[in-house]
């Protein structure tokens, strides 16, 4: 009888300890868009064609010279490449047309919304001097941030490019600002 009571007491203690145990934290995996920034820009243009001759321009994140930092700021709006691992832009190759579509991939663990806010506040919509972008959107797709700016007189909308990239990514943006 004593053994039986001892076994019941031990089982009760074990069960109560298990019930008080900490639950495993459930973390949402960060969505990732497959492909390089260059590939993704080209696929986006296939989804939403433009009526001008444009091209993809990779951004060299390792160039810390004055020209390299100017290019980073001019394309992405960022002062530093510390929170991104890859960047590329799609812009017109000739003429003065206000259009720039930029994709950056954030480093693992970076807050993509904070990167997007820095891009939006840091970008110069008059970087072309004689023309200005008046339609600007920044959207987050997992670890990829998209900045699209253009002049609405062109007949295009920034939202149409966000929608095209959503088709390429395979999921809707987590945020659009």
Language-model-derived ranges and their functions:
Residues 1, 20-21:
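Intrinsically disordered, low-complexity sequence elements enriched in Ser/Thr/Gly/Pro
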Residues 15-19:
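C-terminal motif of bacterial Sec signal peptides marking the signal peptidase cleavage site
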Residues 2-10:
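Sec-dependent signal peptide recognition
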Residues 21-100, 106-177:
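Soluble, non-membrane globular domain cores that form compact, hydrophobic packing
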């Amino acid at each position: 009888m004593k053994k039986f009571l001892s076994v019941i007491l031990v089982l009760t203690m074990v069960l109560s300890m298990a019930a008080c145990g900490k639950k495993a934290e459930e973390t949402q995996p960060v969505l990732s868009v497959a492909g390089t920034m260059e590939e993704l820009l080209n696929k986006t243009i296939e989804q939403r064609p433009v009526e001008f001759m444009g091209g993809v321009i990779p951004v060299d994140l390792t160039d810390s010279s004055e020209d390299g930092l100017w290019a980073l700021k001019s394309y992405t709006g960022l002062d530093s490449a510390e929170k991104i691992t890859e960047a590329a832009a799609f812009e017109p190759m000739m003429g003065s047309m206000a259009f720039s579509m930029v994709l950056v991939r954030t480093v693992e663990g970076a807050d993509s919304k904070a990167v997007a806010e820095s891009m939006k506040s840091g970008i110069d919509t008059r970087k072309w001097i004689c023309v200005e972008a008046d339609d600007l959107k920044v959207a987050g797709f997992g670890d990829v941030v998209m900045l699209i700016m253009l002049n609405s007189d062109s007949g295009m909308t920034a939202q149409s490019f966000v929608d095209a990239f959503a088709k390429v990514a395979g999921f809707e943006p987590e945020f659009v600002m």
